[in-house]
């Protein structure tokens, strides 16, 4: 897949184009003909990448969180979960591929894993409905959480959605109830649960998989009650002011950790998770492993209390 550059990455894109051009010339001029020049350009591109990503504003982080080449649920499963067996369907209506989940081994430990899947191209994005789950997806999630508790397996979730699907059929089949039931099941689980926001964390559609003991977030991910575009349309009747809304909503990982909404920020490679997906996936794996080890000796009652205390604290802080 060809590299996709965001607006603020244009200077980097220009350098990468020059590197490709010199590499092609090097093939005809002979081995090593432009090695010095190519390396100098690569070093400069890396410097620009570090500078750009060290100073992103909230709107730029939103763009990074939505980057089409950012790793998604199936990438994390492929990189972290061995012997993965996907489980489909909610046993009531259908199988919603916006949420994918199943059983597997995470670094040797049996787990239940699930999350939103957006897809990487037109075909898979349509198949997964761009990560916007219908009621069947959340009911499937509840089914998997029930199974995890029955067999005493930790739950690992990956959150990446603009929000639950707002279509007429979804509403007719009880979208709000399905989201509420999934959120409730998260909060009442008697097994360890770790959620990681790996891209967008949009509204109730995200929190339905994020009511965990520990909520992690990638460095350039976002988590909010509504999209910046939606907030701008409501507040100012102007979706073009999404950048202003993103700043005021405090949706970045750095804001969220100060507010106590998330527990840990997972650093991304220079240039974002999409620039080195393998490194990003393993960094998430290391963080999840740390959190699961910290909860290994906790009883079901302790896990439930820790989880409820965590979310009650968020509510109390909001009232102060």
UniProtKB/Swiss-Prot annotation:
<dbReference type="GO" id="GO:0016743">
    <property type="term" value="F:carboxyl- or carbamoyltransferase activity"/>
</dbReference>
<dbReference type="GO" id="GO:0003989">
    <property type="term" value="F:acetyl-CoA carboxylase activity"/>
</dbReference>
<keyword id="KW-0963">Cytoplasm</keyword>
<comment type="function">
    <text>Component of the acetyl coenzyme A carboxylase (ACC) complex. First, biotin carboxylase catalyzes the carboxylation of biotin on its carrier protein (BCCP) and then the CO(2) group is transferred by the carboxyltransferase to acetyl-CoA to form malonyl-CoA.</text>
</comment>
<dbReference type="InterPro" id="IPR001095">
    <property type="entry name" value="Acetyl_CoA_COase_a_su"/>
</dbReference>
<keyword id="KW-0443">Lipid metabolism</keyword>
<keyword id="KW-0275">Fatty acid biosynthesis</keyword>
<dbReference type="Pfam" id="PF03255">
    <property type="entry name" value="ACCA"/>
</dbReference>
<comment type="similarity">
    <text>Belongs to the AccA family.</text>
</comment>
<keyword id="KW-0067">ATP-binding</keyword>
<keyword id="KW-0444">Lipid biosynthesis</keyword>
<comment type="pathway">
    <text>Lipid metabolism; malonyl-CoA biosynthesis; malonyl-CoA from acetyl-CoA: step 1/1.</text>
</comment>
<dbReference type="GO" id="GO:2001295">
    <property type="term" value="P:malonyl-CoA biosynthetic process"/>
</dbReference>
<dbReference type="InterPro" id="IPR011763">
    <property type="entry name" value="COA_CT_C"/>
</dbReference>
<protein>
    <recommendedName>
        <fullName>Acetyl-coenzyme A carboxylase carboxyl transferase subunit alpha</fullName>
        <ecNumber>2.1.3.15</ecNumber>
    </recommendedName>
</protein>
<dbReference type="GO" id="GO:0006633">
    <property type="term" value="P:fatty acid biosynthetic process"/>
</dbReference>
<keyword id="KW-0276">Fatty acid metabolism</keyword>
<dbReference type="GO" id="GO:0005524">
    <property type="term" value="F:ATP binding"/>
</dbReference>
<keyword id="KW-0808">Transferase</keyword>
<dbReference type="GO" id="GO:0009317">
    <property type="term" value="C:acetyl-CoA carboxylase complex"/>
</dbReference>
<dbReference type="InterPro" id="IPR029045">
    <property type="entry name" value="ClpP/crotonase-like_dom_sf"/>
</dbReference>
<comment type="subunit">
    <text>Acetyl-CoA carboxylase is a heterohexamer composed of biotin carboxyl carrier protein (AccB), biotin carboxylase (AccC) and two subunits each of ACCase subunit alpha (AccA) and ACCase subunit beta (AccD).</text>
</comment>
<keyword id="KW-0547">Nucleotide-binding</keyword>
<feature type="domain" description="CoA carboxyltransferase C-terminal">
    <location>
        <begin position="33"/>
        <end position="294"/>
    </location>
</feature>
